[in-house]
Amino acid sequence: AGRTLSKNGPHSLDIFELAIKINLIGTFNVLRLAALAMAENEPNETGERGVIINTASVAAFDGQIGQAAYSASKGGIAGMTLPIARDLARNGIRVMTIAPGIFKTPMVAMMTEEVQASLEAQIPFPARLGDPAYYAQLAQSIIENPYLNGEVIRLDGAVRMSPK
């Protein structure tokens, strides 16, 4: 993380590039290889051969100060969802993206209770951190609903991140 321009100079291009490589290029690389394998599957009764579910972040839409690299990398994942869904339609492969908000993760668990309470206070309803089971439930719904394709779904309790 880093600001675009700080008293120490411009944001490190190496750090920006690393975030893009890990989050965006890493996601695309796994996606393209999964699509190659799925294209060999026998189609089901509706012609579907599989569904790819990517993970972005609400930071793709509401990036905070110091999150340019992270937001750009997650925004790229959101941005490639529809065109890749269109690309893979002829192969019977659906593509969806989940953009989670603030979830109970090992990283959040390392934060103080005060910081966690502050994060929860930003979430309109339900005013609590996301449970990983919510993500799993949404992924299952995406898999089971054959008409979901080419869309990014925010899973965030209506949170909109403040600039800071």
Predicted segments, located by residue:
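Conserved mid-core segment of classical short-chain dehydrogenase/reductases
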Residues: 1-17, 40-46, 66-69, 109
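Catalytic Tyr-X3-Lys loop
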Residues: 9-29, 53, 77
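Active-site helix of classical SDR
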Residues: 31, 73
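Alpha-helical segment proximal to the catalytic Tyr-Lys
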Residues: 36, 85-87
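Residue(s) in the substrate-gating loop at a strand-loop-helix junction
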Residues: 57
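Active-site loop immediately N-terminal to the catalytic Tyr-X3-Lys motif
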Residues: 62-68, 91
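Short, flexible catalytic-loop segment of classical short-chain dehydrogenase/reductase
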Residues: 95, 99-110
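C-terminal helical subdomain
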Residues: 97, 118-157
